[in-house]
Amino acid sequence: MKFSTALLCLLLTAASFSTFVLAQPDSVSIPITCCFSMVKRKIPMQKLESYMRITNSQCPQEAVIFKTKASREICADPKQKWVQDYMNHLDQKSQAQKP
């Protein structure tokens, strides 16, 4: 009887602690997109639709993810001149489309 009472107390304590941990906002797992390899060659500009910068501290390196019109995502090095030029072009294109 003493053993089952002790076990019940232990389980209740563990359950209350796990509820506390799950209620913490930092314990929520948010999916993170990271790039582990970069494209080596230029992508044809006419195939691109948009881009997204990846600067998350949990990723091994900074990157730019270009999204193509075919919905593919391609990682590129933001330090490369052509990548910067493409980002500027896409920014100007999106500004021109806004009324």
Swiss-Prot record:
Specify whether Manganese is a keyword of the entry: no
For this UniProt record, the keywords arranged alphabetically read as follows:
Chemotaxis, Cytokine, Disulfide bond, Heparin-binding, Inflammatory response, Pyrrolidone carboxylic acid, Secreted, Signal
Q: Does the keyword Isomerase apply?
A: no
One annotated GO molecular function is: chemokine activity
Q: Please state the span of the N-terminal signal peptide per the UniProt entry.
A: 1-23
Positions bearing Pyrrolidone carboxylic acid: Q24
Pfam families named in the record:
IL8
Chief location of this protein within or outside the cell: secreted
Q: InterPro entries, per this entry?
A: Chemokine_b/g/d (IPR039809), Chemokine_CC_CS (IPR000827), Chemokine_IL8-like_dom (IPR001811), Interleukin_8-like_sf (IPR036048)
Could you tell me which SMART domains the record lists for this protein?
SCY
Gene Ontology CC terms, in alphabetical order: extracellular space
Highest taxon of the lineage: Eukaryota
Where are the coiled-coil regions?
A: none
Q: Which GO terms describe its biological process?
A: antimicrobial humoral immune response mediated by antimicrobial peptide; calcium ion transport; cell-cell signaling; chemokine-mediated signaling pathway; eosinophil chemotaxis; exocytosis; inflammatory response; intracellular calcium ion homeostasis
State the disulfide connectivity. Answer: C34-C59, C35-C75
Where is it located?
Secreted
Q: Please explain the role this protein plays, according to its UniProt record.
A: Chemotactic factor that attracts monocytes. This protein can bind heparin.
Q: How does it assemble?
A: Monomer or homodimer; in equilibrium.
In which family does this protein belong, per the annotation?
Answer: Belongs to the intercrine beta (chemokine CC) family.
**What is the recorded name of this protein?**
C-C motif chemokine 8
Instruction: Name the gene.
Output: CCL8
